[in-house]
Amino acid sequence: MANRISVELPRTSYYTGDVVAGAVVLQTDKEVDARGLYLDVLGRESTVISRGSGKQRVTYRSQADILGWRLPLHAAGVVPPGVQRFPFQFQIPVYGLPSYTGTHAKVVYAITARLDVPWWPDAVRNETIFVFFARESVRTFSNPVRFWSGDPNDQTGPQVYVELDGDRFFARELIGCRITLLRLGDHRVRRVYVRLVGGEWARAQRAEETTTTTISELEIPMESIRVGQPFTFEVPIPADIQSSYKGTYSYYSYLLRIGLDIAWATDLVAETPLVIVR
């Protein structure tokens, strides 16, 4: 009979700084002379970028380990028959990265329990855990943001002035926003659009890629806005977004973009970076 191994965890989602406590359960039908039972804990950021096609296709890869530990649970020797539990615990780094899966980058945390048996297939069990930023590490108080389109010192043309109630947000929250349109003159603004844009940057060896996605978008009809008077609205943040992070070979960030669709002219755009996490 094959040796059987499993990993018991109270949950699979954790915050940075959390202690992960569980047990490896080993079941053997007879004595096993093993080289040891151990638990590998790995957190890894990796990037993969491909160039070309067919025979000319080249794939570049880079990776950086956030953590890499081996926890010995049983020394080399004879493991008696029956069911045995081996408890373990480790702490996710306070300054670790959140779990992430994107177009060219990913951050994965995994634990692997292994009974190393010479001249016989090892008993192996893999489990993935999901890591999120601890809320207190992201925001302890609100930091209001003010920004303009173009040069704030230029008083000669149309301009949009934007006020936000903060620069760090969580999924499912609402971004409080207030805009003021200034000096439109004879320009005809057809609409005001607001876009929350997420962007991934990844580097693998000598290759780089940037991927952007519109997370949410809304339009404000000009009939609702008066020039020179503040207009207040809210931008919803979806629940299933990726978390902002900055790693060794990749990062993910957000941009709030507010634009004026001006007839017969280039759009007037004001934008600012935001930190958003799950």
Segments predicted by a language model, with ranges:
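C-terminal beta-sandwich interaction modules and adjacent acidic
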Residues: 1-278
